[in-house]
Amino acid sequence: MTGQELIAYKNWAVVGDVLNPSKFAHKIKNRLKEAGHNVFLINPRDESGEVFTSLQDIHEKVDVIDLCINPKLGIKIIKEADTLGMDKVLIQPGAASEEILSFCKEKNIIYVEGCALVELSKKGI
């Protein structure tokens, strides 16, 4: 699967510092919304109550997870995704690790290492 194929899916969970305007997770969230996607916001460290802290808190279908977080936290998210039957992830630069990639391969989770902003730009968004 390619990044362009992932971008075609409509329901996204963006995982990272989604409330901080200086972070890529925030920018990705905004661009996905501008492109007409449904976007769920996840930050495992959030204490504000403004976003979800885990994937299991989302009670709607998630097609793709955008992983924009430190790999040490990212592996926990990927393992949670597997238990919830979520099977597609876009892994942003800096969010990948051998452990994450090996786990995805082992569990048949479809993954693309790439950038959502680049993929959206290719579509003119």
Segments and roles (model prediction):
Residues K27-I28, K76-A81, I100-F103:
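A short acidic, amphipathic alpha-helical/loop segment
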Residues M1-T2, E50, S54, L73-I77, ...:
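Short acidic active-site motifs
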Residues P93-L120:
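Rossmann-fold NAD(P)-binding glycine/threonine-rich loop
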Residues A35-N38, R45-N70, Y111:
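Mobile, glycine- and charge-enriched loop segments
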Residues H37, L84-V89, K107-I109:
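A short helix->loop->beta-strand "cap" motif at the edges of active sites that frequently abuts
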Residues M1-R45, E50:
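Hydrophobic, well-ordered beta-alpha structural blocks that scaffold small-molecule cofactor pockets
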Residues T2-G3, A116-I125:
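C-terminal helix-to-coil terminal segments
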Residues L55-A95:
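Mid-chain, well-packed structural core segment of small domains
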